[in-house]
Amino acid sequence: MQEVAPGTEAESGRGSRRAPRKHRMLRWSATTLAVLILAVAGTGYLYYRHLNSNIEQDDLNLGDNKVAEPTPNAAGQTPLNILIIGSDARDNEENQKLGGAKETFGSTPLADVQMLLHLSADRSNLSVVSMPRDTLVKIPKCTDPDDGKVYAASNGRAMTNQSLGHGGPGCTVATWQELTGIHIDHFMMVDFSGVVSMADAIGGVPVCVDANIHSRDSEGHGSGLKLKKGTTSIKGEQALQWLRTRYGFEDGSDLARAKAQHMYMNSMVRELRANATLSSPNKLRKLAEQATGAITVDSGLGTVKKLYDLSNELRKVEPERITMTTMPNRYVGARVEPTEDAEKLFRLVREDIALDGKDAKKAIAEKAEAASDDPAAEKDEIGILVQNGTRTDALAAASGRASTVAGQLVEEGYDKAVSDRTGSLSEATTLVRYPSAELEGDAQAVAKSLGIPMSSVKKSTDVSGVTLVVGADWREGTTYKAPKQDDTTPKTAEALNGADDTACMHVNPGFTWS
């Protein structure tokens, strides 16, 4: 049975809300287009100050819970996670003309496109994870930064696209972090008209369908996309139609639409890299004006300089190292929910493991070589606090785990090991945390004594000394047995490589023509 938050409408998730300010709610996945346009552009136009005034800003995270930032790699680099949010809001006539039901004008917006861009710490690869708009999730409590209105956490599960109406894009960010455990650094949004203008400026993006398509039903519903079988270069409003098409592709679901969006984005990246016409300063200035005028970002990306710095990071990734995926899911009535494979995909992103599998050996080597330069103190001089983190949503904390493991450490010569009796925590995997570089060697020595992998030794400002958190993966025994982890991308994520120029969307037989 579908679960929804009280006071929401199960079918559409719409409700009343104050009229949104101009350009506040922006939409569709072509936000990525704005970033990538800047990524291939020259530097000359980037310093015009007036471009900064084009960029709208909003708060990054409206929830109470924060996710810790990832630990830097050996080179001091950290991954970068950007949430792309697209809204169905039609808050001005220009966007209303581009399609959609007239009755939705000015109503509470829904986040109908949600994609997480993960740029690896070493900037060698880029992963994209799409979440279907009708995914059932728990939306956390969020506070609107404009008027202070507090939106209570959902009672049960609600469709993820409703999160945008709970104070703004920062609530969608909070919802993603609650579900995935992934620290999100930034968000970006773009409007309908921005998609059209920027796609026009590029000059066309090639896409493929395996049959003639007209995505419009007998009642006039649908994007209106009409293409002949084969490859067509689309731009402007036709590009927007492609990004919005649902009925005409595959099974007519939002999952098919996400797949088509991935194909478009991959093709767009290839086109941007190959299109010599973008070397024209006039074209680049036009693109800069359109890109900065179309996007809304958090304050961390709120200037052209910051966007340019981001674009320089993104442009380091070659198309063959870009992987597009969709969150593995299963149907619950007309909605979907994450599967076990979804958590596996989220873990790969959290641990900065490339979804194309090409750096698996490198990751293993780095973990093996991660020994600290800081020598460990003598065992009997190392203070260790052991915490019980075995509690999960399904299981109570395993009784006495902190004292049992602390006792084992004392037997091994760590005389200053003590258990934390203040209460149980919830940690999926066992971790050894340390606050500063001078204790890194001590933390690694403790981990080695118990068989805990070096990848589970983390620097954290939340602790004041070496702290061992016994996780849910170690509910019994005194020697840690690291679970064997499969670091391959789940097949159910339907991965699409950025260099694949042979991909072709399957047309729903009910929407073809001759």
Regions found by a protein language model. Give the residues of each.
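Non-catalytic, solvent-exposed segments at the cell envelope interface
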Residues: 1-514
